[in-house]
Amino acid sequence: MDTDLNAIKKVNTRNNLIFIADVVLFFILLNTLPFTPEANKSLALLVFIAILWLTEALHVTVTALLVPILGILLGLVKSKEALAAFADPTIFLFFGGFALATALHIQNLDRLIANKIMAMSYGKLSVAAIYLFAVTAFLSMWMSNTATAAMMLPLAMGILSKLDPKRDHNTYVFVLLGIAYSASIGGMGTLVGSPPNGIVATQLGISFAEWMKYGLPIMLILMPLMIGVLYVVFRPKFDLQFEQSFEKIDLTPTRILTLIIFALTATGWIFSSKINPALSSLLGLQSKIASFDTIIALIATAVICITRIATWKQIQEGTEWGVLFLFGGGLTLSAILGNTGASKIMADGIVAFIEGGHYYIIGLIVATFIIFLTEFTSNTASAALLVPIFISIAEALNIQSLGLALIIGLGASCAFMLPVATPPNAIVFGTGMLKQTEMVKAGFWLNIICVFVIGTIGYLFWF
């Protein structure tokens, strides 16, 4: 107990010192930067928020709330404009995603899907491991990566319990890391799969279906590469048949209705570009429905409550409100930097160093930067901070802003080396069945592969 208290005191002392130093630096920059008064204020605010986000001296959500507060007090943005970002359509799209995930979880459909697919392995450990990874990735496309990893872990441990933890240690590590990494990679596949995706989509006006054109191929490429890396590094043994004993979950009318709502929602998101004009014409509207993906999400949320599939309280508890506030803070900061010219000042400064470099090399450098940065920082906070800056850099370099933004957004989900990097990493590390050095060994090579995959595809198709 005393050890825990001492550790908490040390963390609090560290965070307090960082916060005080950050405040001092804020006022120094405010009075010494050589640009226009508005740009000086914006850049000082950016540095202040960036330090808090990257060090997590304050909770990232609290820091996000400081953005509109300080922006208003510094005269950089009006109250209505600052708070409007917290009602951005993408925030409500993610809220609908949380509601849908809650419905699947409350009705035990996530477990039902997992059990049905695992039953197809017929007791073969190698097949079961691949199915575990595939189901984890699929569910992470629609649910929180954290919730998916937490749900799949007991299923994996039940299968691994037939093995000897010492003799078959490498097989344990292979399966556990595969679940964590599949959760992160799966989150790249859809717009609602991971918060950084939504940040990029909001900045560039990308729809759900458009995001899948970029994120899904990356996901499908990285999944087999991830499995290959884990196999080469750990050489697991699969010479075992295991008995299948999954909990019985009946397909009740309520669960069938939930699956129908899920299927209709996913279909609406994927084919929104065709459904929207047809529906608008049918309703006699003059133009297409704006933010159609978000409207679909809100309809799904309402139907889930109306049909009693999940209660409002359950949806409240299943929603990561901090993530939604972080979205709002990031969008407000982006607007402030753009309106005051601070983004252009930073972009011009960075461009001065990299101008003339080959676009492929620039893409690799950006991918390396974001992937290794998010080993130590929140991927959502990093994306909220960096996406608008790199959009400005792309514009200054006269290349597609889509390219660098996607590299940042997708690269932010590729933190595989450390337990603290992502919640799925922490969840499997918490089993005590693997060492940090083992995660670092596999994660480092997977990080490098992600750098080249994302950087190369970015150069060939996004720039």
Show where each model-derived region lies:
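Alpha-helical transmembrane segments
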Residues: L163-V173, V233-K248, I306-I315, Q400, ...
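Membrane-interface alpha-helices at helix entry/exit sites of multi-pass transporters
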Residues: N115, A119-Y131, K162-L177, F208-G215, ...
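C-terminal transmembrane helix pair
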Residues: K166, M212-P217, G329-L333, L337, ...
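Hydrophobic transmembrane alpha-helices of multi-pass small-molecule transporters
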Residues: M1-L93, E210-D348, L446-N447, V451, ...
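Alpha-helical transmembrane segments and, especially, the helix-loop junctions at the ends
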Residues: F98, T136-L153, N170-I206, M223-Y231, ...
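Interfacial segments of multi-pass membrane proteins
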Residues: L70-G71, A201-A209, M433-Q436
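Cytosolic regulatory regions of ion transport systems
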Residues: T3-T13, A119-G123, T136, W142, ...
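Membrane-embedded alpha-helical segments and adjacent helix-loop junctions characteristic
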Residues: V62, L66-K166, Q316-L397
